[in-house]
Amino acid sequence: MALPTHTQLNYRIWHYTYLFFCGLVFFFLIAPLFVILPLSFNAEQYIHFSAKMLALDPEGFSLRWYEDMIYGTKNPWGLATKNSLIIAFFATIGSTILGTVAALGLSSRYMPYKAAFMALLISPMIVPLIISGTAIFFFMAKVGLAATHTGIVLSHIILGTPFVVITVTATLTGFDHSVTRAAASLGSNPVNTFMKITLPLIMPGVISGALFAFVT
């Protein structure tokens, strides 16, 4: 965004310095992707920038690594990708349901101890991941779910629910509860009111939270 012409010099210096450092951080985060992506098309036995790749020779590029990941029988990448997608799918469903229900409860004006419950629900996001992971591992080992798909799904539900709670709660901030009371006065039951009125209105927050939970 351009600065007004009457902006003072010291503010201009600070503004452009700030933009420079923001660009530097952005470059630091994005640059590795521009290095890894070309390497994934390497035709050599080892992943590196070969002489043919640097010379832009078509023989230096190949889809062998993608083919090996998808169709390879001895490569564990295909199985790992499949397991990750399955776990992410079920964890997203669980996190979205729990997070949405929790956010609806927290949005009620009759809900006691809102701050305490909110802090408890988002604590997996605040606590360092190594601490959360260690605690979840020992708990899952105690109940016999360590190294199982069920245990991993439950663990990711715990870590993904806070994202849904935050996004749905933010959406419910501007929610007009008079529409639900109007639906109830016209004879609509709570389930029908939620499915036809509340859910469509908060759907952007639910979808955003689900996406965050999926990538978590």
Regions found by a protein language model. Give the residues of each.
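Transmembrane alpha-helices
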Residues: 20-21, 30-33, 165-168, 175-177, ...
